C-alpha cells in the first residue's frame, strides 16, 4: 500500500512589499506598490493595503496608480529579497531536505518523513511559520495536503498569516464545490471555455469523461480530469532547475501585429522580474504569437551574451516581432515573451537569429 504523502506549500505574504515595509517603518500600514514608475512598467508586488484598491502583481503600473492614487511606489531590490529568501529556505531545511523552491517567495516541502520528529504536518507548518515570523519579522501562509496541487490551493485559503489543511478523507468534500478558476492553469479564457460547456466547479468537471475533456481541451484535458479528482503524483523535486521562463497574454479582441508593442514591453518586464528570482541566466529570447486562426509561431534569438537588463530583453523581443512574415492583415489573439536556455553564468558562443 502506497504511503500517503504530507506536502506543505509555503507562500510568503506579499513578500516584496512586506520586506519593504519591514525595512522602512514609514511604509507600514500604507499602500505600497513594488514597481518602477513609468508607462511601460508592471507591478512586481503590492501590499495588502494596496490590494484593497484592486492593485495586483503583473498589472501595468499606470493602472495601479489610477486604482490607488495614494500608493507609494518603491523600486524593487531583488538582492535584498534573495537574501531574505535564503533565510526562509534555511528554516525549511531544518525540517526536511525535500524542498522545491518555486520562486523567492514560495516552495513545496515534503514532510512525510520530517527531520524534526513531529508527526503532524500541521504542527510542522505552524512551527515553520512561527520561525519565519521570529527570524525575519515577516509572515507566511501554508497549505497542507496529500499532494502539491491541493497544498498550493490550500495555502491561499487563510491568507495572510494563516494555514489550511485538506486531509485525505476531506479531498472530495473540498473539491466538489471548488470553482474551476481555482485550478492552476485555468485563467479567464479557459474559465470562459469551461463555462460555455456548463463546467463551473470541479464537481461539474467530474461529470466529463477523460476522452471528452481531451477532445475539447487537448492535453490540458487530462490535467483537468486529474485535478478535479485531486490526483497529482508529481514529487517534490529539490534539485529542479529552471529551463525556461515566459509570460503570455491573451487579448479580449484580436489585434494586428503593429498593436502588439505595448503588450510585448509589459510581458518582457514581467518575464525579466521572474528571472530575477533565479540564480541562473537565460540566453535565448523567445517571442510567441498565436493568430486568430490559432496558428502558433515562435521567433527566437540567442545573442552573444545573455540579456543583462529588462531593456535588452524588451528590445530583442520587439526586434523579433519584425521577423514575423505573415500577411499584414493577420490578427493575433495571444503574445508571449520568454527566456530559455537557462544555465550557470559562463561565456557563450555567438548565436544566430532563427525561426521555428
Curated annotation (Swiss-Prot):
Binds 2 magnesium ions per subunit. The active site is at residue 106. It comes from the Bacteria. Keywords: Cytoplasm, DNA damage, DNA repair, DNA replication, DNA-binding, DNA-directed DNA polymerase, Magnesium, Metal-binding, Mutator protein, Nucleotidyltransferase, Transferase. Gene3D superfamilies: 3.30.70.270, 3.40.1170.60, 5' to 3' exonuclease, C-terminal subdomain (1.10.150.20), DNA polymerase, Y-family, little finger domain (3.30.1490.100). One of its GO terms (cellular component) is cytosol. This is DNA polymerase IV. It comes from Stenotrophomonas maltophilia (strain R551-3). The gene is dinB.
